[in-house]
Every structure is written in structure tokens, then in C-alpha cells.
A protein has these predicted regions:
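Internal catalytic-core helix/loop-beta-alpha segment
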Residues: 82-114, 120
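Short, solvent-exposed amphipathic alpha-helical segments in soluble enzyme
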Residues: 51-59, 75-77, 126-131, 150-154, ...
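Gly/Ser/Thr-rich loops at beta-strand to alpha-helix junctions
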Residues: 40-48, 115-122, 141-142
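Hydrophobic/aromatic-rich, well-ordered segments within soluble, folded domains that form packed cores
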Residues: 107-137
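Short, flexible loop segments at boundaries between secondary-structure elements
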Residues: 138-153, 165
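N-terminal, charge-rich interaction modules
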Residues: 1-88
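A polyampholytic, Gly/Pro-enriched intrinsically disordered region
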Residues: 80-89, 156-165
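Short hydrophobic/aromatic-enriched beta-strand-loop microsegments
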Residues: 57-64, 131-139
């Protein structure tokens, strides 16, 4: 599934609460997360930042890139399950959707390493994540987006996915 040009602008709007790059302190992030919440991170920087704050995402989706430049992969020695998929920029592949769905039934923490680009994988994550999970991803040049999975969020991302089909 490819991202049509007319959807690009829509996806620039955060799906959830935006924590500004100028205000990335631990309290602002932690107060949005309860201890028993399933936490999913999409993006190398987001994953790395959460690990540095002492948070352990149950699912981490990374691609070894930041703003399309090679970067060091975040270190996490607690990973129990490693998965991988191929997902070209501007697309959501069937393979990546299946791997994301599978990740929710694997022993956590799960790390999915994407060959390609992980940015759009926030969409299938929001569809498959358990109710009330927290999904975090970076909003380029703005900050961190924190999404709580609700029926409304699922409906919103499903519409986006339907348009991409």
C-alpha cells in the first residue's frame, strides 16, 4: 500500500498529544503513562529516548535511520523477541502488517527492525495495539507524539489505511 500525495499533509497532524522538542522532560512523558500500560515506540530516536528515561517499550520499531540518515541502533539488552520486515519509504507492506500483528503475541520486549522506513508503521500499530496502549512516535522537527489507543484512533487510522489500499 502506497501513501497517496493527498494524504501526506493529513499525516503531518499528530494522532495524539504532542510533547514539544523544547520540553522533553521525564515528568511530561511519564505522567501520560501508567505502569500497567502497553507501550509501543516507533522510531529510533523515540525508542532510544524512552529507554534512556528508564521506560521499557513492549514493542520497539526501528530502522537504523533518523531523518533518512544512518544512525546507531538504540541499545536494549532486555529484548526477548527480534523480528524484521521490509517496508519501503512511503509504503505499508503486507509483510510489515503481519509482523506487527505477530509482535503483539510474542514475548516482550519485542524489537522489529525494518529494512526501509518505519514511519508509516504507526498506522498498523494503532490498529493492532490493545485498547488503552500508548504508542509513541516522533513528529519531525516538532517533538514526540503520544497516542492512547481508543476506538476513535482505530477508526481514524483505519480510514487512512483504506485510502492507501
Amino acid at each position: 500500500m502506497q501513501l497517496p500525495d493527498d494524504l501526506r499533509d493529513q499525516l503531518k497532524n499528530p494522532l495524539g498529544n504532542l510533547v514539544s522538542d523544547n520540553d522533553p522532560n521525564k515528568e511530561n512523558i511519564l505522567k501520560k503513562i501508567s505502569a500497567d500500560t502497553t507501550l509501543i515506540t516507533v522510531g529510533d530516536r523515540t525508542t532510544e529516548n524512552m529507554l534512556q528515561l528508564g521506560l521499557k517499550p513492549q514493542i520497539q520499531i526501528i530502522d537504523g535511520l533518523e531523518k533518512r540518515n544512518q544512525r546507531t541502533v538504540p541499545t536494549d539488552d532486555t529484548i526477548n523477541t527480534k523480528l524484521s520486515c521490509r517496508n519501503p519509504p512511503g509504503e505499508i507492506t503486507e509483510e510489515s502488517m503481519q509482523v506487527i500483528q505477530k509482535a503483539f503475541s510474542c514475548e516482550s520486549p519485542v524489537r522489529i527492525t525494518v529494512d526501509g522506513e518505519e514511519d508509516l508503521l504507526v498506522i498498523p500499530v494503532c490498529i493492532h495495539a490493545p485498547e488503552n496502549s500508548i504508542v509513541m512516535y516522533g513528529q519531525p522537527n516538532e517533538g514526540l507524539v503520544i497516542v492512547t489507543i481508543t476506538p476513535e484512533i482505530r477508526a481514524k487510522v483505519q480510514k487512512i489505511l483504506d485510502i492507501m489500499n
